[in-house]
Amino acid sequence: MFIHQADNWTNFVWDKDKISDKLMQVMQALGYMHGRLSMLGFEEQLKATAESITAEIVSTSQIEGITLKTNSVRSSVARRLGVPADGVAESISHDVEGIVTVELDATHNYSQPLTHERLFNWHNELFPIDRRKHYQIDIGQYRTHGMQVVSGNMGRERVHYQAPEAQRVPQEMEIFLNWYNDATIAASPLKAAIAHFWFVCIHPFDD
């Protein structure tokens, strides 16, 4: 049985004793970071923010097996944030521009409601129009077929996880978004962790 096949599967529970120390470390690190930033001038804060966003985009892309040119990402982020560029400007691909667009919207407009349409727009940005002919997937919409996490050679595959059936995805995402946008549930590292796990379990998009 996969998690989404259980009754009330989104009623997540966790062991507070096992995560309390980690959560405290995260909150202390956040406090330290905000304290350091507050000591910087406005321009230095922008530069620090640009470097942080650049590093996150590059490292997140590597997790997905995508290697981006750090200088190209930095140039795109700096231009969007109005940070003076150092050295020769890098040429910026559509791939980089799309990923930067998604990252900046997510990090700078985090107080805006997360909607189906916003997620569709993010998915569109990740697959530039000039390269879509290379992808045999649904883009800018929820997937219309099954999704599995599989390893192994062809004919000897091992299914590690099977996501909810495609016809369930819109309703599952509606439940998820209602929870995510609930103002009575305060933003926190724990909420972010639950949201990440929940979203991955649904796996609503092709990739």
What do these predicted regions represent?
Residues M1-D207:
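FIC/Doc superfamily catalytic core
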